[in-house]
Curated annotation (Swiss-Prot):
Protein known as: Probable histidine kinase 6
Record has Iron-sulfur as a keyword: no
Topology within the bilayer: Multi-pass membrane protein
SMART domains: CHASE, HATPase_c, HisKA, REC
Gene: HK6
Keyword Aminoacyl-tRNA synthetase among UniProt keywords: no
Extracellular side: 34-306
Source organism of this protein record: Oryza sativa subsp. japonica (Rice)
Length: 970
């Protein structure tokens, strides 16, 4: 009992001591901060007072210097010139015009030194008599100082003897004895009623030495220059230019008589003691007078809040420290409780993630299932006998449905990316064929807009690479689609090269190291830019000089065209740099920071004018990062945009299956190998792109700027002579063709043939961007080729033009007939709870001769597939009532295992060959997330077909399964 009491008493004593220490610390801090504040205030007062005193002296000195200069002027032009070059009018005009140099002087006047014996002659010469300050005749005295020249502002001083006044006489005597400016006592100036002083300066005759004695100065004195100095105006002007005037009070005193200082400026000092006060000495150059400036604060410096808040805060902190120590264990208990709650939240978050996946699966299935029915029925409708109007309506509805499916897929892709469940494939694919396929998607749109659309792949890029072609295509489709959408004139140019080459060449262009140029954008003679279309591009590095570095230094050899350069290297990674350049509207500067934000567009008008949801770029950025690259852009409003992304892929190894490559690309024909052609194109970038596609077919191309040069090349002029018997084609760009003049050049072709210079006329091919160009110029040519050009489309046109017979490839057989031979008579079971989907799938398979049986539940499917059965394949919906597709497939596999075991035992007893029974089961669902695919494989399904599917997807899947079943049976 005693110990707790003692402990309590000790705690009370410690608490009291703690409070006393806290109070002492706070009190000391208050005193210290208050002392520091007063010291800083005093330092500031001293600084401001000294600064004002220094500037006052400087301004006073400047005015004195101007008066001194005026004295020298009088000495020079009044005494050295005979007759004098200065009279009253001259003096008045000069002083009036130069008064801006003496703003603090009310006026200046010059008084000449006259001895008594010269007075009569002087007065006769001037025509007036000297007067005193009281306007009376000057009494006789040893010498006089009558004012002979005066500024108009002090014209009342004319004829007055300045020696008649006692104080003025003393100033004159001191001024000529010292050679310096001397001042009077302060007095009220006439006119302004301001306090001021009279400044007097002696004027000496020329030739006075600088170290002259007093007697020599007095002897050489010729007159006196004086002016009224407005001290109040001087100080007011000074203080108006300085900061802090509202804080301090300035007084200027004449302290020649220290016991009775005379105020020259400022209010009267308050009665009582002033806490902060500073005196600065003023030196106005008069050795006989003393002046000083006295400064004080207008109000007592306030006590800073820190002197109150800091001590109070310190006291509070001391109190809080004690409280914190006491509350430490309580805090520990609270942290333990928070940890427990966090564990619960973690469990809830994991459950939410599972729920999110289930929600995505459900939403995907519920949306895509009816869309599958809509699109399937539209496909079936288009296969019937429709009028043109009905067919147009159905095709429009089909296009809208596919656009909706694309949007759904984009949203689901974004969700899969955020959930970290998007995986990339690694399969070999032909990069150049894929690029051509992407460009072909937008060919009709580019022709409608009359814009150039082209693709170029550098020679050092491998032909076959390993990666995910579908995701690679998705990025390209998004970027090229945006470029075409936002471009109304000019071009869209897709370029693929190796990243390491792209960086080096771009730096060379940026630093201006190529061909001795300064790195500026090169233009043609007519002012157009050296780009694909002649319009300016956003990225100024992408000019012709940069593009030349991407081209091979020599024409590709025919042998090189046949072999795949990717097989010359071992399997390794390659980083591709793909840029999509357009000359569209560009991206506004304020919107460039949110370009890759999902569902965000530049502004509200973007969606109205161009459509779209703003999710494509976000997905493209995520996919590029998943491929080990990144995406960036350069955009200039009303000029265009250039999007660049990189992707890390693998080179295809030597042992890569040729069948895999054939399935991913269409082999180009070799019938055109060795042919020669001339391309007439005035734009070097576009000409290089066209030559690239022709070179892929084995055609050797020479590019010229105009048709005249082409004919000269054809005729063997300018030192160039092509092999005439092999020159098969003459390609001409539509914007180069000038019918009124170039038709004469074509007539020249016939003359060359008639003269024997050309054995056979080449075929004329016109390259056009739109239907209008074909209608305008096409009649003069053998064939018109629409852009964007691809190697396959060129081959098709040239086959028609040159009547070239190409061997039919095995894989170019009639696909429907081939599939009919595979599927005819096959028994296929379709399981789906949606009757519309059943009709769509059944119609697609029946079209190729398959025998289709449909059921609407998993239980019915299990009953029909009891061993033995007659079905060759089964399409199984995943989400169905009562029994879903997963459970139905598991039961089917269990029945197969049991039946195979029984059959195997029976075959062993009979000595016959055992053939395992396996029914191909393909998942058929609208759920496209990775978790569903994994569940399909886990349950025993053989494949996966997502809804909405088309006929192509159906027959490819079935043919693969049927062929696989045949091979396993053999």
């Amino acid at each position: 009992m005693g110990k707790p009491e003692a402990r309590s008493g000790w705690r009370n004593a410690a608490a009291a001591a703690w409070v006393l220490v806290a109070v002492a610390c706070a009190a000391y801090m208050h005193w210290h901060l208050r002392r520091e504040t007063m010291d800083r205030a005093e330092e500031r007062l001293v600084s401001m007072c000294e600064e004002r005193a220094r500037m006052l002296q400087e301004q006073f000195g400047v005015t004195v210097n101007h008066v001194h200069a005026l004295a020298i002027l009088i000495s020079t032009f009044h005494f050295e010139k005979f007759p004098s070059a200065i009279d009253q009018d001259t003096f008045a005009k000069y002083t009036a015009r130069t008064s801006f140099e003496r703003p603090l002087l009310n006026g200046v006047a010059y008084a000449q030194r006259i001895f008594h014996h010269e007075r009569e002659m002087f007065e006769n010469q001037q025509g007036w008599i000297m007067k005193t300050m009281k306007r009376q005749a000057a009494p006789p005295q040893d010498e006089y100082a009558p004012v002979i020249f005066s500024q108009d502002t002090v014209s009342y001083l004319a004829r007055i003897d300045m020696m008649s006044g006692e104080e003025d006489r003393e100033n004159i005597l001191r001024a000529r004895a010292t050679g310096k400016a001397v001042l009077t006592n302060p007095f009220r100036l006439l006119g302004s009623n301001h306090l001021g002083v009279v400044l007097t300066f002696a004027v000496y005759r020329p030739g006075l030495a600088a170290d002259a004695s007093v007697e020599e100065r007095v002897e050489a004195t010729a007159g006196y220059l004086g002016g009224a100095f407005d001290v109040e105006s001087l100080v007011e002007n000074l203080l108006s230019k300085l900061a802090g005037n509202q804080d301090i009070v300035v007084n200027v005193y004449d302290v020649t008589n220290a016991s009775e200082p005379m105020a020259m400026y400022g209010p009267q000092s308050p009665d009582g003691k002033v806490s902060l006060f500073h005196v600065s000495t003023l030196d106005f150059g008069d050795p006989f007078r003393a002046h000083e400036m006295r400064c004080r604060y207008r109000q007592k410096p306030p006590l800073p809040w820190s002197a109150i808040t800091n001590p109070l805060g310190t006291f509070v902190i001391w109190m809080l420290v004690g409280y914190i120590i006491c509350a430490a264990w309580s805090r520990y208990d609270k942290v333990s409780e928070d940890c427990r709650k966090m564990e619960e939240l973690k469990t809830q978050a994991e459950a939410a993630d599972v729920a999110k996946s289930q929600f995505l699966a459900t939403v995907s299935h519920e949306i895509r299932t009816p869309m599958n029915g809509v699109l399937g029925m539209l496909d079936m409708l288009l296969g019937t006998d429709l009028s043109m109007t009905q067919k147009d309506y159905a095709q429009t509805a089909q296009m809208c449905g596919r656009a909706l499916i694309t949007l759904i897929n984009d949203v689901l892709d974004r969700a899969k990316i955020e959930a970290g469940k998007l995986e990339l494939e690694a399969v070999p694919f032909d990069l150049r064929s894929l690029m051509d396929d992407v460009i072909s998607l937008f060919s009709s749109k580019s022709r409608e807009k009359c814009i150039e659309l082209a693709v170029f792949v550098c020679d050092d890029v491998p032909k076959v690479v390993i990666g995910d072609p579908w995701r690679y295509r998705q990025i390209l489709t998004n970027l090229v689609g945006n470029a075409v959408k936002f471009t109304e004139r000019g071009h869209v140019f897709v370029r693929v090269c190796l990243a390491e080459n792209s960086k080096v060449e771009a730096n060379q262009v940026l630093n201006g190291t190529m061909n001795g140029k300064d790195g500026k954008v090169e233009t043609t003679a007519n002012g157009a830019f050296n780009t694909l279309s002649g319009f300016q591009a956003a990225d100024e590095r992408n000019n012709w000089d940069y593009f030349k570095l991407l081209l091979s230094d020599k024409e590709p050899h025919m042998d090189e065209l046949e072999c795949d350069r990717s097989y010359q290297n071992d399997c390794d990674c390659v980083t591709l740099m793909i840029s999509i350049e357009d000359t569209g509207v560009g991206i506004p500067l304020h919107a460039q920071d949110r370009v890759f934000t999902p569902f965000m567009q530049a502004d509200s008008s973007t969606s109205r004018n161009y459509g779209g949801t703003g999710i494509g770029l976000s997905i493209s950025k995520c996919l590029a990062e998943l491929m080990g690259g990144q995406i960036s852009f350069t955009s200039r409003p009303f000029v265009g945009s250039t999007f660049t992304f990189s992707a890390v892929l693998k080179r295809s190894c030597k042992d890569t299956s040729s069948d895999s490559k054939r399935s991913l690309s269409e082999a180009l024909p070799t019938a055109f190998k060795g042919m020669k052609a001339i391309l007439v194109d005035g734009r070097p970038v576009r000409g290089a792109v066209t030559r690239y596609h022709l070179n892929r077919l084995g055609i050797v191309v020479k590019v010229v700027n105009n048709l005249s040069m082409g004919l000269q090349t054809l005729a063997g002029q300018n030192g160039v002579k092509e092999s005439r018997e092999k020159l098969s084609m003459l390609f001409i760009e539509s914007d180069i063709w000038r019918p009124e003049t170039d038709i004469l050049l074509l007539n020249r072709l016939h003359e060359l043939k008639n003269n024997g210079q050309v054995h056979e006329l080449p075929k004329l091919v016109l390259l056009v961007t739109s239907e209008a160009d074909k209608d305008r110029y096409g009649s003069a040519f053998d064939i018109v080729m629409y852009k964007p050009i691809r190697a396959s489309t060129i081959a098709s046109c040239l086959q028609q033009l040159l009547k070239v017979v190409m061997p039919e490839r095995k894989d170019n057989q009639n696909r429907p007939s081939f599939l009919r031979s595979l599927l005819i008579g096959k028994n296929i079971l379709i399981v789906d709870d949606n009757k519309v989907n059943l009709r769509v799938a059944a119609a697609a398979l029946k079209k190729y001769g398959a025998k289709v049986h449909c059921v609407e539940s998993g239980k019915d499917a299990v009953s029909l597939l009891q061993q033995p059965h007659c079905f060759d394949a089964c399409f199984m919906d995943v989400q169905m009532p009562e029994m879903d597709g997963f459970e139905a497939t598991r039961q089917i596999r269990q029945m197969e295992v049991k039946a195979n075991e029984e059959r195997k035992a029976l075959d062993l007893m009979e000595g016959s060959t055992f053939v395992e029974s396996h029914l191909p089961v393909l998942a058929m669902t609208a759920d496209v997330i990775q978790a569903t695919y994994e569940e399909c494989i886990k349950s025993g399904m053989d494949g996966y077909v997502s809804k909405p599917f088309d006929e192509e997807q159906l027959y490819q899947a079935v043919s693969r399964l049927v062929v696989g079943t045949k091979e396993s049976a053999v």
